[in-house]
Amino acid sequence: VGTVVLERLVRELNGVECTDFEPEPPPSKATAVTRCFGEPVREVAALREAMVRRAVRAAEKIRAQDLAATRLIAFAHGSRFKPNAPSASRIARLSPATNDPRVIGGMAGRMADVMYETGGVYTKCGVMLEGLEPMTAHQADLFAVPDPRSPALLAAIDGLNGRFGRN
C-alpha cells in the first residue's frame, strides 16, 4: 500500500520513465516576500516603509522572470502570542497586469496606511503577487498612454541593483 508518488518512484528506480523531462521549470503562479521585523513596529511610517520594500522586492522577482502580476495581497500582523494583536490584510487588483515596482510599491504603501491600527504593535508584514502571467501575454489598457521611458528606467534600476545591491 503506497501513494502515487511512491509508485512512480519505484517504477523510476526500475527504469520505467513516468514523467517527461522539463528542461525549464514552469513559470511561477505567485511570489511572496515576507519578513519578521527585527524589533516591533509601532509607527505607520515604519510599517509603510517595510511594506514598500517587500513590494519592490517582489516586483523585482517577477520582473526577473519576465512576468506581470494581476493581484497584490498585503498583510501585517502583531505577535500571535499576544491577545488582541493587530492583524490585517488587503487585496488589490492590478489592471493592467504589471511588474513595475513604482506601481506595486505605491499600492502596497497605500494598503499599509489603510491596515495600520493606531497603537498597534506589528511584528511581521509581507506582500504576495498572484495571477502571474508572461509580460508578452497580458492585455494592455486600451486608454493608457504608455511612457516610452519606463522600460529604460526599469532596466537602469535593475542594472544599478545588480551592480551595487538593493540597499
Which residues make up each language-model segment?
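Acidic, metal-coordinating catalytic segment for phosphate/diphosphate chemistry
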Residues: 94-167
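DNA-contacting surface of Y-family translesion DNA polymerases
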Residues: 1-119
